[in-house]
Swiss-Prot record:
Protein name: Small ribosomal subunit protein uS11c
Biological classification of the source: Eukaryota, Viridiplantae, Streptophyta, Embryophyta, Tracheophyta
Subunit annotation: Part of the 30S ribosomal subunit.
Localisation per UniProt entry: Plastid
Source organism: Cuscuta exaltata (Tall dodder)
Main location, first listed in the record: plastid
Entry keyword Plastid: yes
Gene Ontology CC: plastid; ribonucleoprotein complex; ribosome
BP GO terms, sorted: translation
C-alpha cells in the first residue's frame, strides 16, 4: 500500500486576513521630513516602531509638485488618518528640513484632532563641520 503524502499548507489555505494585529496606540511621535523636493511623514509609537507613513510621492504627486505645501498637507493627512482610527490621542511632532511643506504638514496635523504635547524642530545644523559644495555659476 502506498504511503499517503502529507498535505503542505499553502498560502491559500492559510488564515484569512492580512495577519497583522491592530494595536491601540494612545501616544505616538509624528516625524515630518520636509526637503525642497518631497515631504515624508512617518508616525511611530513611543518606542520608535513605524505605525504609518506617507509621502507626497505616494499621495499621487509627481515631479515638482511633490515639493508644494499642498502635497505635504495631503501626505500628512493620509499618514494620520490610519493612526486616528487606531486610537491615537496624543502625539509629539518632530520637524526636520528646510522644505516648503513644514508649515502645511503641521497645519494638517493640528486639524486632525490629535492633542500635540510639543512641536520640536530637529533640523541638523553643522557647527562648522564639512565644507559645503562650491557655489553655482549660472
Amino acid at each position: 500500500m502506498a504511503k499517503s503524502i502529507p498535505r503542505i499548507s499553502s498560502r491559500r489555505n492559510g488564515p484569512i486576513g492580512s495577519g497583522k494585529t491592530v494595536r491601540r496606540i494612545p501616544k505616538g511621535v509624528i516625524h515630518v521630513q520636509a526637503s525642497f523636493h518631497n515631504t515624508i511623514v512617518a508616525v511611530t509609537d513611543v518606542r520608535g516602531r513605524v505605525v504609518s507613513w506617507s509621502s507626497a510621492g505616494t499621495s499621487g504627486f509627481k515631479g515638482t509638485r511633490r515639493g508644494t505645501p499642498f502635497a505635504a498637507q495631503t501626505a500628512a493627512t493620509k499618514a494620520i488618518r490610519t493612526v486616528v482610527d487606531q486610537g491615537m490621542l496624543r502625539a509629539e511632532v518632530l520637524i526636520k528640513g528646510p522644505g516648503l511643506g513644514r508649515d502645511a504638514a503641521l497645519r494638517a496635523i493640528r486639524r486632525s484632532g490629535i492633542l500635540l504635547t510639543f512641536v520640536r524642530d530637529v533640523t541638523p545644523m553643522p557647527h562648522n563641520g564639512c565644507r559645503p559644495p562650491k557655489k553655482r555659476r549660472v
